Amino acid sequence: MSRIIGRKGINYIHRLNSASFTSVSASSIEKGQNRVIDASLTLIRERAKLKGELVRLLGGAKASTSLLGVPLGHNSSFLQGPAFAPPRIREAIWCGSTNSATEEGKELKDPRVLTDVGDVPVQEIRDCGVDDDRLMNVISESVKLVMEEEPLRPLVLGGDHSISYPVVRAVSEKLGGPVDILHLDAHPDIYDCFEGNKYSHASSFARIMEGGYARRLLQVGIRSINQEGREQGKRFGVEQYEMRTFSKDRPMLENLKLGEGVKGVYISIDVDCLDPAFAPGVSHIEPGGLSFRDVLNILHNLQADVVGADVVEFNPQRDTVDGMTAMVAAKLVRELAAKISK
């Protein structure tokens, strides 16, 4: 089903051709696609330039977090609601029920801590028949546009977990070398090619590791893993910390030091790393997960230069009426912004 939906844009173009545009050549369609992609990148480029200039004029920031939304859900193997997450997370970040300071006292209203460059228009691009190979390149290029405007660093709002591959690829290529990755998730997302989709949200870290974009990959919160997940972990030298041993691993995981000898550390948080008691609004509910304070302890105590991050797999269509998981995702974003900015 996901592969059929994944080709929706291409099928849409085919229907147009058969119905009323039979004389439109493939090259003309490609030129049109290129115009849409160029326009999409131009908007992100100009917004990043504006936000970067603002932060530089204010001065005093060595690193500043900039939000980039990637509302992509078609690579999910189950539900596609994560495509609707970025606006809900933004709404929750600025919800009047809480203040705009992080736990460590950083003020989110200060552009040196947090800016926003908008969303990659995923559905608009796909509606023009753009395939996933090109779409992944657009996402990577968008991340690089943010990073070109120093001191901005990307904090990406998913979307399903397939977005981590093009984002990490962009961060690694832009910095000129691999990073260490701290990945919090109920699942390892390291299938070689899940259900025939190499870009599946269940395969993102296989693409990252085989591309050489990460030196170390630490996966924390794992509690849904099969034989292939373990074999792939061994193949790539992944450090997998399962929930069944978390009480034993906790002292080490709450005092991590990462990134020495590489270009920095990337943090990827799948909201389903949390126990569903804390975050019910996810596509793949897995009981027995981390508490929210477990996650914050890991983040707050981490010794690292965090060069990028993502928060993925929040599904607003499964959230509670009062938007509890949206607030949870927003809190993760707020604390990640504090960790990145300096």
From Swiss-Prot:
Mn(2+) 1 binds at H161, D185, D189, D270. Signal peptide: none annotated. It catalyses: L-arginine + H2O = urea + L-ornithine; agmatine + H2O = urea + putrescine. GO terms for cellular component: cytosol; mitochondrion. Pathway: Nitrogen metabolism; urea cycle; L-ornithine and urea from L-arginine: step 1/1; Amine and polyamine biosynthesis; putrescine biosynthesis via agmatine pathway; putrescine from agmatine: step 1/1. Its EC number is 3.5.3.1, 3.5.3.11. Mn(2+) 2 binds at D185, H187, D270, D272. Its cofactor is Mn(2+). InterPro entries: Ureohydrolase (IPR006035), Ureohydrolase_dom_sf (IPR023696), Ureohydrolase_Mn_BS (IPR020855). L-ornithine binds at S77, G96, S97, T98, N99, D189, I190, Y191, S224. The lineage of its organism: Eukaryota, Viridiplantae, Streptophyta, Embryophyta, Tracheophyta. Disruption phenotype: Increased formation of lateral and adventitious roots and increased production of NO in roots. Keywords: Arginine metabolism, Hydrolase, Manganese, Metal-binding, Mitochondrion, Putrescine biosynthesis, Transit peptide. Gene3D superfamilies: Ureohydrolase domain. Substrate binds at E195, G196, N197, E313. The gene is ARGAH1. Its main location: mitochondrion. SUPFAM superfamilies: Arginase/deacetylase (SSF52768). Pfam families: Arginase. It comes from Arabidopsis thaliana (Mouse-ear cress). Expressed in vasculature of roots, root tips, cotyledons, leaves, cauline leaves, stems, sepals and pollen. This is Arginase 1, mitochondrial.
